[in-house]
Amino acid sequence: MNNLKINLHPNDEKIHFNEKDHSYKINGKSIQFSVSQIIDDFFPKFDSEYWSRVKAKERLDFLGKSYSIEKLNETQKKIIDEWELKRDEAAKKGTLLHEAIEEYYNRGELTDLIPEFKFFQEFLKKYPKIQPYRTEWRVFDSKNSIAGTIDMVYKKKNGDLFIFDWKRSTKLVNDIGTVIKSDFDYGFDELSNISNNSYNKYCLQQNLYKYILEDNYGKKVSSMNLLVLHPRYHTYFHIQVPDLTKETEFLIRKAREKVI
């Protein structure tokens, strides 16, 4: 596999990513928004205090015994700790998968230590002619102080690009690959038509990446995609991302207002 450093862009020298706090700098100056951050600003935040209390009561009620407020507090803390541990483990495993795919594309190295990597290999077998262009590409829009990292960029024969994000998640599709579009609550302002779920947020991320590449890098992005790779499933699931032009323009406009 060819080293994809041959496709460097002049902007690559200007952007720096801090792994510890997941922040970006452009020419040494901190940017205001990551792609995920500007999106999260327009959706309800998960109230862990409230929902952990609800789950603690459910857990104790299931036992069919009376309990003290101290026992309720203890159970609530245990649930919060369980959530944090699960989140940390998922993040670590997701990072390992991303690194394994990057190693494959940049060094030709394969691994059998990550179960879901075999699904990525199945994807490659189905599309053997796709041309890799960049992995883990950090991109930015200096005018609006936004930056993010695209997991994978492929190139068509006509020069157009198409982008992928790898998702090691069970929140995007069910066991037969149907997209989970829960609509418990919705976004704010001009995103009030967008339900608050992982699928919609990832679609907005992809649309922002497309905007950044086309407006700042002189590229044409022909399609946006998510590839779900999780050991719970029997195979990979490929999700094509729709164009959300109006919503993307809104996010860019709000970012610009805060920068100015």
How would you name each of these model-derived features?
Residues S36-D40, S169, P242-T248:
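A short, sequence-level motif marking secondary-structure junctions
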Residues I6-P10, V139, I146-K156, L161, ...:
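A broadly tuned preference for mixed-charge, low-complexity surface segments
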Residues M1-L96:
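Charged, glycine-rich intrinsically disordered N-terminal tails and low-complexity linkers that flank
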Residues M1-N2, H9-K14, N106, S142-K143, ...:
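Accessory terminal regions of nucleic-acid processing enzymes
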Residues I79-L191:
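Catalytic cores of nuclease domains that cleave nucleic-acid phosphodiester backbones
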Residues S30-Q37, I114-F117, N196-N197:
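Secondary-structure junction/capping motif
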Residues S195-I260:
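Metal-dependent nuclease catalytic regions and adjoining charged, substrate-binding loops involved
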